[in-house]
Amino acid sequence: MSGAELISDLRARFGQAVLSEQSTNDAFPTLWIAPDAAPAVHRYLKHDVAKPFALLADLWAIDETARKHREGQPPSGITIASHLISLGRNADIVLKCPLDAKAPRATSIASVYPNADWYEREAFDLFGVHFDGRHDHRRILLPPLWEGHPLRKDQPARATEKPPFVMTAARFDAEEKALMIDPEALGLPTERDGVELMILNYGPHSMATHGVFRVVLALDGEEIVAARPDIGFHHRGAEKMGERQSWHQFIPYTDRIDYLGGVISEMPYLQAVERLCGITVPDRAKTIRIMLSEIYRIMNHLLLYGTMAQDCGAMSPVFYMFTDRERGYRIIEAITGARMHPGWFRIGGVAADLPEGWDRLVREFLDWMPKRLDDYAGMVLGNEIFRGRTVGIAAYDTATALDWGITGPGLRATGCDWDLRKARPYGGYENFEFEVPTGNNGDCYDRVLVRVEEMRQSLRIIRQCLDHMPSGPIKADHPLTTPPPRERMLHDIDTLIHHFVGVSWGPVVPAGEATGQAETVRGLTQYALVSDGATCSYRTRIRTPSFAHLQAVSAIAPGLTVADLVAYLGSIDYVMSDVDR
């Protein structure tokens, strides 16, 4: 069934509840539906349609009140959008519901897609959208006593636009009291079989939480009866920043969403911008992007490998692996001039060509790593203590993973081979040969094993980049390429002015909507951008894998021990900046 056939099917089944189809820059359909029909439409797409849309990739809101270009869309003050993916069809669909701006109310779909829970809380927190059918409208990223909903267009983007912040003694006491654990508000049981449960605040300063994040646990002895993750400590308004920075200036911010992923996190953002602009990236730039992305994938997975061993009691591996990571960073430094956050991709290409001697550094790295991975297999994967701490621990199947929005290695560990680089190749990946590693049991051990095998496949991809690096330009010959190639600006005053305006104010991107998706180090990272024909984004929606993966803790942790939880959290491989944005 094609996208057009699916829309015809939905129109026939739901009649006037299907309001209209919206034209976007994406290849998949976007459909407006009545808010009260949302649960029924989502339920049909998940359970009843052939090759169902089992994955709710994202759910977000858009404040339409200041938008100028809404041609072909129904009236809406606040829009709720949900992005669904069918792995069987390898297809997507976006459903939108128009809401009132003053008192936005939608209908919850958490009973259909369990992972909608946190996304709906986020839409309430940042936009003030109330969801009928929900019992929990607590904030999720902001403090409980925060006033207002900051992603609304009437809310300032800078602290200098607000009155000075003053923390009085009374306010300090109120804020501290609001953060106290209330088991009833969290939905935590306080007893089981007549036995009182211990409520344990795990984090946010525990080394095992790998960042500023806490889990509130209800314990019966060492057994976890219930778990409630608490996030938001690292929130810094990245999506709001996307509305005030130019399209070009926002690139460095994408590195800091997942601060261990480096340039790999720039890929989905630039895909969306380039789709809006109609830019085709040259082959040499594509190959350079892929090579650097795969180096960063190895850097990340080595860190996970070492710290996971450390969480399970082995100290030595992480120090050996930092030596390997340093070799990778030598390549990154030589090419980009930076290490963790290069901000090096550009709209239409990359910042500069490869330096002299890059191939020698890459070849040395490729010759070095396979033997090291062989050594670590015996040191970690074959270690009896490590296996005892990870085999059979925190296991889940593919259906559970999809219910909770788990992608990347966490999904592939269940035996599902869905990888965007293979399923829907982007940015030149269609030109490379590599395998998609999978596990069998979906446990902590398999999640580590999949990442280890992914490193070997990344080495394979990098070697193909080394052996078959195309010649040619590193930036697209397009008016909106930013900054434009120097040869476009040195001819006359007109080209010089175009360069000056494009760099100082930023390129004016045509009005429209576009989505960029990438298989980043943790899973599906997605940018849904709305342009209103200006020098900056009207709405920058960032879908991160870590946000979805941490939400699943509440479903998977019960039945584990506290020691098991340490291994489980380590195997998720989340980054708190990726969660909180």
Swiss-Prot record:
Chain intervals for the UniProt region annotation (NADH dehydrogenase I subunit D): 196-581
Catalysis: reaction(s): a quinone + NADH + 5 H(+)(in) = a quinol + NAD(+) + 4 H(+)(out)
Gene Ontology terms for molecular function: NAD binding; NADH dehydrogenase (ubiquinone) activity; NADH:ubiquinone reductase (non-electrogenic) activity; quinone binding
Main location: membrane
One cellular component term from this protein's GO annotations in UniProt: plasma membrane
Keywords for this protein: Cell inner membrane, Cell membrane, Membrane, Multifunctional enzyme, NAD, Quinone, Translocase, Transport, Ubiquinone
Membrane topology: Peripheral membrane protein
Region: NADH dehydrogenase I subunit C, residue numbers: 1-172
InterPro entries linked to this entry: NADH_DH_suCD (IPR023062), NADH_Q_OxRdtase_suD (IPR001135), NADH_quin_OxRdtase_su_C/D-like (IPR037232), NADH_UbQ_OxRdtase_30kDa_su (IPR001268), NADH_UbQ_OxRdtase_49kDa_CS (IPR014029), NDH1_su_D/H (IPR022885), NiFe-Hase_large (IPR029014)
Domain of life: Bacteria
UniProt keyword annotation of NAD present: yes
Cell compartment(s), UniProt: Cell inner membrane
Enzyme Commission number(s) of this protein: 7.1.1.-
Xref: HAMAP family: NDH1_NuoCD_1, NDH1_NuoD
Subunit (UniProt): NDH-1 is composed of 13 different subunits. Subunits NuoB, CD, E, F, and G constitute the peripheral sector of the complex.
Family: In the N-terminal section; belongs to the complex I 30 kDa subunit family.
Function (record text): NDH-1 shuttles electrons from NADH, via FMN and iron-sulfur (Fe-S) centers, to quinones in the respiratory chain. The immediate electron acceptor for the enzyme in this species is believed to be ubiquinone. Couples the redox reaction to proton translocation (for every two electrons transferred, four hydrogen ions are translocated across the cytoplasmic membrane), and thus conserves the redox energy in a proton gradient.
NCBIfam families on file: NuoD, PRK06075.1, PRK11742.1
Annotated protein name in UniProt: NADH-quinone oxidoreductase subunit C/D
Source organism of this protein record: Rhodopseudomonas palustris (strain BisA53)
Taxonomic path: Bacteria, Pseudomonadati, Pseudomonadota, Alphaproteobacteria, Hyphomicrobiales
